[in-house]
C-alpha cells in the first residue's frame, strides 16, 4: 500500500472518530436535557453546534400565578450579559475612530462630576473592570425608586461621587458603574440614545428581534417573571419586580435564548465587529475572580479549551452565554428562578463545561 493510500485511509478513520465523538456528546446533551425537571430548573436552554441549533427546550413556568409555561420564545432577564453588548457597542465606536481605548473619560465627558474618574480612568479600564469604580447594584440601588430610571443619566447620581475602590488600572473590581459610564460615552460620541444605538447597530444586524430594554411600566408579551426567595420570610418564591429597573448599560435587558445565540454568531462571524477588533475583544486582559477577562467578555482558560461569553445573575435571574471555541458549541441558558446548585442554571452550565471542554484544569 503506497503512502498516499495510507494517508487517505488514516484521514477517513480520523474523520469517523471525530464524527462519532461529536455524536456521542450530542446524545449525552439530549439525555441530560430530557432529565431536567421543572421543579429544579425553570427557563430555556439552547445548544448549537457549528452554528446550527441541535437542542432548544423550555422548562417550568413563566408565571407561577397564572400557570403560564416558559416557551422557546419567552423573554428572560439576561442581567449582566448586557455588559457584553455594551462592550461591543464601545468597540464599534473604537473601530470607527470615535473612541480611544487608552483615553480618559474626561475626553468624552468633560462635565462628569467625579474629577478622578474624568482625569484618570480610561476606556480600557472601564471595559476590564479595573477603573476602581464600584458596583452600584449592590449599593443604594436596591432601596431606590426603580420607576425613575428612564435614561442612562438617571443611574449616574447613585455612584458618580463615590470614592474609588482602588487606583485606576491597579486592581480588578467588578463594576456595573463603569459600564454605565461607557453607556454615557456611547451616547456622547454617537449622538444617539444608548438604547437606539443598540437597536440600530447590534440588534438589527444580528437579527435580534426579541431583545429589549423594557420600560418597567410597559407590558411585554412572552416575558418570564423572575422568582426569588431572597429577603423573604418563607421558602415560597415571590416575583422579583421590586428588585428590577429598566435596563442600564450594565444589565437587565430582556432577550430569548435564540436571540443571544444570534448575537454570539454575529459577533464571531464578523457582522458586528471586524475580525481584528473581535480578536482584540476576545484577548485576555486581566484576571478576574475566577476567569480571565477580555473587553466585556469572560475568557475561561480553566478547561481543555477556551470558553468565552458572559454570565448574569440577580434575584430570580440567572443567565449564561458560552462559546466553546475549539469544538464550536454555543450554549445559552436563561432561568427565571434563583440558582439552586446542581440542577440550577450554574449547575447546568457546569455540565456543559465538563462534557464539552473536558477535565477541569487547576485555577
Q: Language-model segments: which ranges?
A:
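Active-site SXXK
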Residues: 45, 51, 75-102, 179-187, ...
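Bacterial Sec-dependent N-terminal signal peptides
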Residues: 1-28
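Short, surface-exposed loop or secondary-structure junction motifs
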Residues: 116-315
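A short acidic/small-residue loop/turn micro-motif
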Residues: 60-64, 244, 338-340
Amino acid at each position: 500500500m503506497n503512502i498516499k493510500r495510507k494517508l487517505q485511509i488514516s484521514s477517513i478513520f480520523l474523520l469517523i472518530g471525530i464524527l462519532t465523538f461529536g455524536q456521542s456528546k450530542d446524545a449525552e446533551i439530549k439525555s441530560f436535557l430530557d432529565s431536567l425537571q421543572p421543579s429544579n430548573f425553570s427557563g430555556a436552554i439552547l445548544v448549537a453546534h457549528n452554528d446550527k441549533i441541535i437542542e432548544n427546550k423550555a422548562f417550568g413556568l413563566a408565571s407561577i400565578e397564572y400557570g403560564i409555561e416558559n416557551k422557546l420564545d419567552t423573554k428572560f432577564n439576561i442581567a449582566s450579559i448586557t455588559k457584553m453588548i455594551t462592550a461591543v457597542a464601545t468597540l464599534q465606536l473604537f473601530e470607527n475612530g470615535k473612541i480611544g481605548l487608552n483615553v480618559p473619560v474626561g475626553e468624552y465627558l468633560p462635565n462628569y462630576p467625579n474629577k478622578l474618574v474624568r482625569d484618570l480612568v480610561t476606556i480600557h479600564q472601564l471595559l476590564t473592570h479595573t477603573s476602581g469604580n464600584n458596583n452600584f447594584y449592590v449599593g443604594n440601588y436596591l432601596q431606590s425608586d426603580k420607576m425613575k430610571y428612564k435614561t442612562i443619566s438617571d443611574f449616574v447620581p447613585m455612584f458618580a461621587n463615590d470614592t474609588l475602590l482602588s487606583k485606576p488600572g491597579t486592581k480588578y473590581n467588578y463594576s456595573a458603574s463603569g459600564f454605565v459610564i461607557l453607556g454615557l460615552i456611547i451616547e456622547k460620541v454617537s449622538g444617539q440614545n444608548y438604547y437606539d444605538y443598540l437597536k440600530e447597530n447590534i440588534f438589527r444586524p444580528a437579527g435580534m428581534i426579541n431583545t429589549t430594554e423594557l420600560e418597567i411600566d410597559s407590558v411585554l408579551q412572552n416575558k418570564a417573571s423572575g422568582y426569588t426567595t431572597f429577603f423573604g420570610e418563607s421558602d415560597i418564591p415571590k416575583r422579583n419586580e421590586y428588585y428590577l429597573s429598566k435596563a442600564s448599560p450594565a444589565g437587565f435587558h430582556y432577550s430569548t435564548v435564540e436571540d443571544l445565540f444570534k448575537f454570539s454568531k454575529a459577533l464571531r462571524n464578523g457582522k458586528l465587529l471586524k475580525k481584528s477588533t473581535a480578536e482584540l475583544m476576545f484577548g485576555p486582559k486581566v484576571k478576574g475572580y475566577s476567569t480571565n477577562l477580555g473587553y466585556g467578555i469572560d475568557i475561561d482558560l480553566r478547561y481543555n479549551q477556551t470558553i468565552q461569553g458572559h454570565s448574569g445573575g440577580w434575584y430570580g435571574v440567572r443567565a449564561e452565554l458560552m462559546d466553546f471555541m475549539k469544538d464550536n458549541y454555543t450554549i445559552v441558558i436563561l432561568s427565571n428562578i434563583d440558582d439552586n446548585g446542581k440542577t440550577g442554571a450554574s449547575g447546568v452550565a457546569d455540565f456543559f463545561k465538563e462534557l464539552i471542554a473536558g477535565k477541569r484544569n487547576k485555577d
